[in-house]
A protein has these predicted regions:
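Active-site scaffold of zinc-dependent metalloenzymes
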Residues: 43-77, 90-93
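Zn2+-dependent metallopeptidase catalytic core
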Residues: 13-36
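Post-HExxH zinc-binding segment in Zn-dependent metallohydrolases
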Residues: 95-118
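Short alpha-helical catalytic segment bearing the HExxH-like zincin motif
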Residues: 78-86
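Conserved acidic
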Residues: 13, 75, 79, 96
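Amphipathic alpha-helical segments in well-ordered regions
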Residues: 24, 86-87, 111
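Acidic/histidine-rich, surface-exposed loop or edge segments in extracytoplasmic proteins
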Residues: 1-8
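Propeptide-to-catalytic entry region of secreted or membrane-anchored zinc metalloproteases
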Residues: 2, 38-46
Length: 118
């Protein structure tokens, strides 16, 4: 799979987050000969104080990650975990898999421990 990743917003340690995303996506996505686009935007906050949102289809996914919730900033580790969670949803869109919060919550810590700060 050819992954085209775009990080928008004021990311702290942008290179680390970018590599983290690539590491996860290359781990979880199937080895197919096609292009996918993953656009990730870091915002001050998200609707309903959520940590993030993901939407898209099998070719392009849009992820929003919040820096804060209820006016409290997420730590770098929390941002990474939230990003891992939304990348599981990206996988679900790209592979046309069922959209499952259970899967995302079940894998977010495993992927964060495997790839964050390695």
């Amino acid at each position: 799979m050819n992954i085209f990743l775009s990080l928008e917003g004021r990311w702290p340690k942008a290179n680390l987050y970018s590599q983290f995303c690539y590491d996860i996506l290359y781990d979880i996505l199937p080895d197919e000969d096609r292009d996918v686009f993953v656009d990730i935007k870091l915002t001050h906050h998200a609707d309903q104080q959520a940590a993030g949102y993901c939407r898209g289809d099998d070719d392009e996914v849009y992820i929003q990650i919040a820096r804060n919730s209820c006016d409290v900033a997420y730590t770098h580790d929390e941002l990474a975990r939230n990003l891992a969670h939304e990348l599981i949803h990206a996988y679900q869109f790209i592979t046309n898999s069922p959209k499952s919060e259970t899967e995302a919550y079940g894998k977010e810590n495993i992927l964060t421990e495997k790839y964050w700060g390695k």
